[in-house]
Amino acid sequence: MSIFQAIILGAVQGLAEFLPISSSGHLAIVEYFFKQEDLPILFDILLHVATLAAVCTVFAKRIAGLFSVLGRFIIRKSKPEDKDDLMMIAAIIVATAVTGVIGLLLKDWVKTIDIRLIPIFFIITGLLLIASSKIKHNKQAKNVTLLTAAITGLAQGIGVIPGISRSGSTISASLFAGLDREKAGEFSFLLSIPAILAAFILEIKSADNLLAGVSPISLISGMISAFVVGYFSLRFLLKLIKNGKLMYFAFYLIPLGLGLSIYFWGFAG
């Protein structure tokens, strides 16, 4: 893998991991056109580490606050104002458990998915973003309930399918469940932390030759690219969520899905 390819793949990961356009779908398409259909396992793992670092950087204060609340709860010194944060922690645990079950059920199928299906899932993601942008609640919830957590965890599990955006599906699910926009965005990205960690652990365990096909400079270049692009992508997306503009990504995903469908089904065999 060249340094240029590493930077491009890192940028794609950084953009698509957070923007509601499906990182796995875009990486699969980029790898296909780069004629590199087996991404080196260590490179893939470290791209996830870089995007995890980006989300932890953006939400550093919030994460520290949640750990502080959890610490007080463990030593039985919780404060009355900790109630909402304790519910957030419980919601993350519930959602992650649901995600794990769905992810395990879909794991083998996702590994062998026909690349021609990915554009169809891009279109589905686009339609989901349009539908969620039309939601108008008279009174949107400011706090995550366990039911909302379970629904959002289900959506995140389905988001392992290439072409189905994890962030798009989780934010949309939270909105459908009645959560307000800012809280839906926050919950989605806090929920991504255990999901990315789990993916990291699974990939490490299943790896045979971590160093195959990639040089140290390519690894570093890809990681830096993924972190920088991911950081600014996440900041940008949080502003769009606040303003209810997620629907804009549908105007990219639907034409992309249609164009790739025509290519794969009509010209690529």
Curated annotation (Swiss-Prot):
It comes from the Bacteria. The keyword Membrane applies. InterPro entries: UppP. It is found in: Cell inner membrane. GO terms for biological process: cell wall organization; peptidoglycan biosynthetic process; regulation of cell shape; response to antibiotic. It catalyses: di-trans,octa-cis-undecaprenyl diphosphate + H2O = di-trans,octa-cis-undecaprenyl phosphate + phosphate + H(+). Keywords: Antibiotic resistance, Cell inner membrane, Cell membrane, Cell shape, Cell wall biogenesis/degradation, Hydrolase, Membrane, Peptidoglycan synthesis, Transmembrane, Transmembrane helix. It holds the Pfam family BacA. Its main location: membrane. The chain crosses the membrane at residues 1-21, 39-59, 86-106, 112-132, 144-164, 184-204, 210-230, 249-269. GO terms for molecular function: undecaprenyl-diphosphatase activity. HAMAP family: Undec_diphosphatase. Belongs to the UppP family. PANTHER family: UNDECAPRENYL-DIPHOSPHATASE. This is Undecaprenyl-diphosphatase. It comes from Treponema denticola (strain ATCC 35405 / DSM 14222 / CIP 103919 / JCM 8153 / KCTC 15104).
